[in-house]
From Swiss-Prot:
Native species: Rickettsia rickettsii (strain Sheila Smith)
Taxonomic lineage: Bacteria, Pseudomonadati, Pseudomonadota, Alphaproteobacteria, Rickettsiales
Protein name: DNA repair protein RecO
Coiled-coil intervals, chain numbering: none
Listed Pfam families: RecO_C, RecO_N
Entry similarity comment: Belongs to the RecO family.
GO BP annotations listed: DNA recombination; double-strand break repair
GO cellular component, one term: bacterial nucleoid
C-alpha cells in the first residue's frame, strides 16, 4: 500500500543505528509515521522537524508503520534555530499537533493554516498569531470559542469575559455579576490595532489553557514544549 502526499515533519525518534521513526502531518491523510534511514549529511538535513517534504509511505498493510521516503521542499530550521522565541513557538505548535491529532485523521484545512503560520513565523514572531493558532487548534478539535458577540445579549461591544461553560464571549453588563467565575477576554483578540500588554498575554494563555485542560489534556497533563514557550514568553516581555 502506498500513500503519497505533502507534509510537515513534526517528530523524529531513533529506532536503531542510522534508522529513525518520523511522524509527518500530511495535507490529505493526517498524521503518518514511517521508518527512514540516514546515511548522509543530506538525509540528516531532510529529516529535521519542521521541514516541508514530499512524503511517500509504503507498507504491505495499512495498519503497519511502513517505510517512508522524503524529498525536501522547504526547511525552516535556519529561521528558528537562532531565535529562542521563534524556536519555542515552533516547538509548541508541532507538539500540540502531535498531542491532539489522531493518527491518519484528515485535517486538510488545518494543514494549510499551519503552513501559513510557519511562513509568518519564519519572518517574525507575533503573539497574536500564536494565540490565534491555539484558538484554531481548539476549533479543529471540536471546541471552538465564539468571541464575536455576547452569548446572552448578542451585543458586539464591551466584550470582556468568556464563559467557561459555553465558550462564548460575554459583555461587561452580562458578566459583571459572575465575574469571579468567568475567564477574561484579552482586548487584542478583538482588535488588530491594540498593543498587547503582559497582563493580556497572561489572560490569553489562561483562556486557551482552560479549554485545553478541560477537554483535551487528559489528567491535566501539560505539553512540555508549550510550557517552555509560555514561561519564556511571560518572563521575557
Amino acid at each position: 500500500m502506498n500513500i503519497k502526499d505533502i507534509g510537515v515533519i513534526i517528530a523524529k525518534k531513533p529506532l536503531k543505528e542510522n534508522t529513525f521513526i518520523i511522524t509527518v502531518f500530511t495535507k490529505n491523510h493526517g498524521l503518518y509515521s514511517g521508518v527512514v534511514k540516514e546515511f548522509s549529511k543530506k538525509s540528516k538535513f531532510i529529516y529535521q522537524e519542521g521541514n516541508i517534504i514530499d512524503f511517500l509511505w509504503q507498507a504491505r498493510l495499512h495498519e503497519h508503520i511502513g517505510m517512508a521516503k522524503c524529498e525536501l521542499i522547504k526547511s525552516y530550521t535556519g529561521y528558528f534555530i537562532t531565535n529562542k522565541t521563534k524556536l519555542y513557538a515552533f516547538n509548541s505548535v508541532i507538539s500540540l499537533i502531535k498531542e491532539l491529532f489522531h493518527e491518519r485523521e484528515e485535517h486538510s484545512k488545518f494543514f494549510s493554516f499551519l503552513i501559513n503560520y510557519l511562513d509568518n513565523l519564519s519572518k517574525h514572531f507575533c503573539f497574536r498569531d500564536y494565540i490565534n493558532f491555539e484558538l484554531a487548534l481548539l476549533a479543529e478539535t471540536g471546541y471552538k470559542l465564539d468571541l464575536t458577540k455576547c452569548g446572552v445579549s448578542h451585543v458586539t461591544t464591551d466584550l470582556i469575559y468568556v464563559s467557561p461553560k459555553s465558550a462564548r464571549a460575554l459583555s461587561y453588563e452580562v458578566g459583571k455579576p459572575y465575574k469571579d467565575k468567568l475567564l477574561m477576554l484579552p482586548r487584542f483578540l478583538l482588535s488588530d490595532n491594540s498593543e498587547i500588554t503582559l497582563e493580556e498575554k497572561r489572560q490569553a494563555l489562561a483562556l486557551t489553557n482552560y479549554f485545553f485542560n478541560r477537554y483535551l489534556f487528559h489528567n491535566n497533563r501539560q505539553v512540555e514544549a508549550r510550557q517552555t514557550f509560555i514561561e519564556y514568553t511571560l518572563n521575557n516581555f
